[in-house]
Structures are given as structure tokens and as C-alpha cells.
Amino acid sequence: MCLLRHLLPIWVLLGFFFFSTATKSQESSVVYVSGASPEIPISQASPRMGAQSPGPPIVKVVLRQDLNKKILIALIVSSSLLCVTVMFLVYLLLWRYRNMKNSFTGIKRKSDSVKSVTTKPTVHKIDSVRKGTIPVYEYQLLESATNKFSDSNVLSRGGRGCLYRACLDEKSSVTVKKLDGGGETDIEKQFETEVDWLAKIRHQNIVSLLGFCVYRQTSCIVYELMQNGSLESQLHGPSQGSGLTWQLRMKIAVDIARGLEYLHEHCHPPVVHRDLKSSSILLDSDFNAKISDFGFATVLTTQNKNLIHKASEDLLDGKVTDKNDVYSFGVILLELLLGKKSVEKPSSEPESIVTWAVPKLSDRANLPNILDPAIKGTMDLKHLYQVAAVAVLCVQPEPSYRPLITDVLHSLIPLLPVELGGSLRIL
């Protein structure tokens, strides 16, 4: 009985109680329909009452046995239904508990043996990951989409990793950046920073983040498809810049300047990229340029002395300003003009393009002779002189002498045809 008290609801027990008591009760009740009430003595009856009731009282006896049987049947049926329902619910709960336990055990064994997608501690530090706003791609999907990261799907190499074309299905292709040096603390920090920044920034000249993947010691970032790879691969790869006309180069320069202007002027607080170079500029099928590689990006108020390269003041005192990005833009502009790498290594002593080019750019008569052979004689010389002057200003050793990126943009837009996003009208 104690066990039943714990298992069955109180109304079921009450049903059994009424059933046991009802069987013992078979008493009847007498209902007086007419005549003098037996509870009133005859001596106290009025003459009128006697006149109306000359004969003996008529009594109708109604037994409660039939009523008790109906109540008893109802209680038995309801109690039985409740018992069956409770037993079914208990069984269902036990069944679900066992299935959940077995499922959890199976998942745990599978993750221990296969070790599929790992969730490194650094991933959970990313604000956008915690908020669930960034899709997470399975490594097996990206591996299959790139044909196991085959060389045939390489868009460009360099920078912080290798870019691959990934075909997710017949209608969807993306760019996958597979980071080098997986597992190293600085690489993980760069990965974390880039994913977090790209999740917050939206601009036509900043690459769009589609998701990421972390698998064991490998980290991948998924971008929108950039069919033409990086600017570095276009300028210094097998084609040696032959596919980039003067107008396309000016378009790329304007696109980069627009992206930087958004970071410096329209982000609050302003953002400094700090790692701008030709390998971090990606090109889509129409050669629209978009900035990537935000692994070192920071807000303008933050000072960090762990700089890789860039302007001289960065290396000396670690100060970070928007003029750092202007210097880097000037280096890219020199690469577009001259077709040379930012740092050439013809001998044991590497030579910076700034050191080599700035003295030569001041000689207008000789300037056309040092241009990239792929664009010689294809531009208006006035436009060439203006671009060269902008580049020299951007790479000035003193940061205060460098222009704002907005001023740079306004200087270049008039040199670009309207159909390419500029204001130049060619008759």
C-alpha cells in the first residue's frame, strides 16, 4: 500500500476507498410521500391534517443500492483508466531516458574515436561565435569541395595561407583560406581576430565572411568566391600582371582606398587594418578588389607593439594610426605602377620597393621607363604623374606628411572612367 501511495495519484486511492466502503453500505432510505409525518405525534396533528389524511400514511421506499452501484462502476472505470495512463506515462519516460542515454554514449564514443570537428578554446572567445551569427562548416565538406585541397583548386598562395576554390554544389562556390601554422598561438589569435572583425564589417570593398572551420590543427575561413585570387598572384604570379590593364589597376587602387576609407572614417571606433599588402587584396570575377586578412586589425585607440612590418614608426615605437594603412596603400600603389614586389631579394640584402622607387619617381622624364612593361604607353602621362605623386606622399617617412585616405581617394577617382566607378568621362 505504501508503494501504491507513491506511484498512484491521490484521486485513484480515493476511488479504491469509496469502492471498499460502498460495498459495505446496503442501507435503504424511506421517503414519505403523503400522510402525516411519522416524526409528528398524532396528538399534535391539526384537524385539517387529519381530514386530508384519513387513512394510514402512504410510504414509498427508495433503496440507495442502485445509485451506489452506478457510482461504484464509474469509480472502477475511471480508476482503471487512470492506472493504465499513469503506467503508460512511466513506461514512456523510462523508454526515452534509456534512448537518450544510449544516444549520448554513442555520440561520445564516436567523437572519441573519430575526433571530427574540434571546438578549440580560442573559438569560444570570438564574440560572433558565442552569439551564433557565424555558420560553422564541417571540415569533411570543405575537403570534399576542394578535392582534398588539391593544387588544381588553388586560387593563390601567400599571405597567411592558401586560397582554394571550393564547389559546395552545382550552384554554390566559395573561397576557402586554409591558414598555415595551425596550432600556433599567434596563428590562432589571428584567426580569432579576423573572424570576429569580418563578422561585424559589411562593405562592398571588404571581403564577405561566410563561415569558418576548425578541425584538429587546421583552421579555415570561408569567404565569398574571389575567382581571380589575390592581387599579389596577379602581379607577381605566372601572368606577371599581363591581365591587369592600366584602367583595371586604377580601379583596384580606388576600390582599396574606398575600403580603407570605410574602416577609418565610417567605423566607430575607427579600425586600422595594420597588415595591408597585395596578398591581402582579393579580386572577384570582375576584378573588384576587396580587403581581407584582418588578423592584425585593431581599433584606432589601441596601441600594440607586436607589428610585423609596415611603416617605419610602427617598428620604432609601436604607435598605431590610420597613417599606417596609408603607408601600406602607397606600397601597393607602387606595385601597381612598377610591377615589382614590395621587397625584392635579388641578393643577400633585400631591397624595399620604397627605397628603390622614390628617388626615381621624382624624375618625370625617366618615369615611363621604370613602369611595369605590361602597362607601358597605355595611359595618359598626366594621370601617371599624378598617381606617382600620390604614391610618394603615402610612403613619406613622417606620418604627419602623409595624406588621409579620403584625400587619396578623391585624387584617384577623377583618373578612373565612369563605367569603372570613377568620374572620368572618355569621349
UniProtKB/Swiss-Prot annotation:
Entry's EC annotation: 2.7.11.1
Q: Which reaction equation describes what this protein catalyses?
A: L-seryl-[protein] + ATP = O-phospho-L-seryl-[protein] + ADP + H(+); L-threonyl-[protein] + ATP = O-phospho-L-threonyl-[protein] + ADP + H(+)
Record the organism: Arabidopsis thaliana (Mouse-ear cress)
Q: Which GO terms describe its molecular function?
A: ATP binding; protein serine kinase activity; protein serine/threonine kinase activity
Q: Which residues bind ATP?
A: L155, S156, R157, G158, G159, R160, G161, C162, L163, K177
Membrane topology note: Single-pass type I membrane protein
The enzyme class is transferase
Signal sequence interval, chain numbering: 1-22
Which classification does the entry list for the species?
Eukaryota, Viridiplantae, Streptophyta, Embryophyta, Tracheophyta
TM helices/strands, residue ranges: 71-91
What Pfam families does this protein's entry cite? PK_Tyr_Ser-Thr
This chain belongs to which protein, by name? Probable receptor-like protein kinase At1g80640
What are the catalytic residues? D275
Q: Which residues lie on this side of the membrane: Extracellular?
A: 23-70
Q: Where is the Protein kinase domain?
A: 149-413
The PTM Phosphotyrosine maps to: Y223
Which ranges make up the Cytoplasmic topological domains here? 92-427
Q: Does the keyword Nucleotide-binding apply?
A: yes
- Keywords of this entry: ATP-binding, Cell membrane, Kinase, Membrane, Nucleotide-binding, Phosphoprotein, Serine/threonine-protein kinase, Signal, Transferase, Transmembrane, Transmembrane helix
A GO cellular-component term linked to this record: plasma membrane
**Which family, according to the similarity comment?**
Belongs to the protein kinase superfamily. Ser/Thr protein kinase family.
For this UniProt entry, what is the primary localization, expressed as one broad class? Answer: membrane
Q: Which residues carry this modification: Phosphoserine?
A: S279
